């Protein structure tokens, strides 16, 4: 049975990437218009059964160009729901929608609008926009945009996401950008994560980045995080503060092996 989408709830959303990918040529676009003013925009999967206390007027199928033109006006004039409008733009087929997203990501009038465009490119148009996201990760002058592009790529299905995050973690000139790259790499669970993050712990010139890289290890899936933290603790060449950080995050783990290690440490057996 299809799940229900309540248009009266402000929390109802377009869902996740899978919903976009499952759409077969059509999406449901809803707008709440009161006294001639658009108050809300929602784009929903065709599989979502819509409910509302208000009367819903069905306009039928709308041509792509007409729909895009209406949405573009709302991106430009109503920042309150520009992200919702950009999400709706993202699910439109064709080059015009993608070009608009790229333009907003590259040179939107506000940082928040740029970030929204970047996110929806990653969620709904990743096959076509992976290269653009990488360009923003490595060439944009704003560290906030580079961080957000990395986050967005990490939340996508892009095949190259782990390679791009590793490169950013090694090469970006901003310590905060490098630190966040390691965190998002760990969240992807990519097989190359441990080796790459261990490199950062051992080699990054910034103390805070090294500490954040240790934290990133704790975010690796299941026992992989515990193993990575054990490796730091067992490396006598690591600075004391880094090993202490590894011990701290190990203590936050629910792993039985971590508890056993801590018991032996407290008993003086290590």
Residue ranges and their predicted role:
Residues 79-80, 95, 110-112, 142-144, ...:
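Alpha-helix N-cap/helix-start positions at coil->helix boundaries
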Residues 62-75, 94-106, 126-138, 158-170, ...:
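Amphipathic alpha-helical scaffolding segments comprising HEAT/armadillo-like alpha-solenoid repeats
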Residues 1-73:
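N-terminal accessory interaction module
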Residues 43-44, 52, 80-91, 115-120:
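Non-membrane alpha-helical segments in proteins
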Residues 87, 119, 151, 183, ...:
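Residue-level signature of alpha-solenoid helical repeat scaffolds
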Residues 148, 179-187, 193, 197-202, ...:
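Alpha-helical adaptor scaffolds
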Residues 83, 115-116, 147-148, 179-180, ...:
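Alpha-solenoid HEAT/ARM repeat scaffold
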């Amino acid at each position: 049975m299809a799940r229900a989408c309540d248009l009266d709830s402000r929390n109802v959303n377009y869902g996740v990437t899978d919903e976009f990918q499952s759409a077969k040529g059509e999406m449901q676009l809803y707008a709440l218009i009161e006294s001639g003013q658009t108050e809300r925009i929602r784009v929903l999967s065709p599989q979502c059964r819509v409910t509302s206390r208000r009367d819903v007027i069905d306009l039928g199928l709308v041509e792509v160009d007409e729909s895009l033109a209406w949405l573009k006006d709302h991106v430009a004039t109503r920042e309150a729901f520009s992200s919702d409008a950009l999400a709706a733009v993202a699910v439109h087929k064709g080059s015009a929608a993608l070009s608009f997203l790229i333009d907003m990501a590259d040179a939107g009038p506000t940082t928040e609008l740029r970030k929204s465009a970047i996110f929806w490119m990653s969620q709904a148009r990743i096959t076509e926009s992976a290269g653009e996201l990488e360009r923003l990760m490595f060439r944009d002058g704003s560290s906030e945009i580079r961080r957000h592009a990395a986050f967005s790529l990490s939340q996508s299905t892009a095949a190259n996401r782990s390679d791009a995050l590793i490169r950013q973690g090694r090469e970006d000139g901003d310590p905060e950008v490098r630190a966040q790259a390691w965190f998002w790499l760990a969240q992807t669970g990519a097989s190359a994560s441990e080796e790459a993050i261990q490199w950062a712990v051992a080699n990054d010139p910034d103390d805070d980045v090294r500490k954040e890289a240790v934290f990133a290890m704790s975010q690796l899936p299941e026992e992989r995080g515990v193993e990575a933290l054990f490796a730091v603790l067992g490396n006598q060449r690591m600075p004391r503060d880094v090993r202490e950080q590894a011990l701290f995050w190990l203590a936050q783990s629910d792993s039985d092996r971590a508890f056993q290690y801590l018991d032996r440490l407290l008993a003086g057996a290590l």
